[in-house]
Amino acid sequence: MRKTSGKQREGAGVSRQLQNIELPAPTFKAGGSLARALQRRRTIREIGDKALPLQTLSNLLWAACGVNRSKGPFGVTGRTAASASNSQEIDVYVALAQGAYLYEPLHHRLQAVASGDLRRLAISRGQAPAGAKAPVRLIFVADIDKLVHTSGFMEPGLRNPDVQRSYYYVDTGLIAANVYLFAACVGLAAWFHNCDKSALWAKLRLRDDQRVLFAQTIGYPASRQTAVRRQNARRRARV
């Protein structure tokens, strides 16, 4: 059984003010070929504030690290993103306007964690506020307990912090790459960046053996959003 810190127990009442979100089943109709997604993949920092439809958020999270097969290595489900010995040690937290959630791939839902808008904390101080109002920020958190206690396999030296870091940084990058490719497929903007690690660790009420690593911002490109607003304004003017 994994240890639970007092910090987590004290914060349980806060998350009750925020409701869990049951995500619709992911759909696979949108998008194009992998080659086209790779061609379009890029970092776009200028991101608008328009909210993503729940279906799009569902598809995004499944693409990031959702379950894609019931039987993976070492007796657990498989994910869209590989991880060291299928340890699945990277947790993805989702910061929305109303609060922060933990994505649960097995049940494909968002578990309420903390009320309030934490999106600004997911950008490091001094970073350009280009995407400050973007609708979604993913926060990547390494759970060392999952890495050390991988079912069915124990690599020599895995308790070495340097070895652990080499794994969880690579595994974070694999998830972030999936997000970039999904964004390229459906015309979204994505930006992988640093974040205020200590502030997020406290707000998310993480354990001592959990590490906040990076964040990734997703939304509609600001240029596209502005163009749509202008088009809608012209339509209203003609009515």
What are the language-model segments listed below?
Residues A84, W191-F192, D208:
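Short, surface-exposed helix-loop/turn micro-motifs enriched in polar/charged residues
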Residues R2-V136, A227, R234-V239:
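N-terminal amphipathic, basic helical "cap/leader" segment at the start of enzyme domains
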Residues L204-V228:
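A glycine-rich helix N-cap at a beta->alpha junction
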Residues A100, H108, L118, K146, ...:
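Surface-exposed, flexible loop/turn segments at secondary-structure boundaries
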Residues H149-G152, T226-R230:
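Short, charged, solvent-exposed linker or helix-capping segments at domain edges/interfaces
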Residues P26, V141-D143, P221:
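Generic beta-structure capping elements
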Residues A95-Q98, A142-I144, I218:
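Short, flexible beta-strand-to-coil junctions
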Residues R41, L60, V92, A134-H149, ...:
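Small-aliphatic-rich amphipathic alpha-helix that forms the alpha element of a beta-alpha
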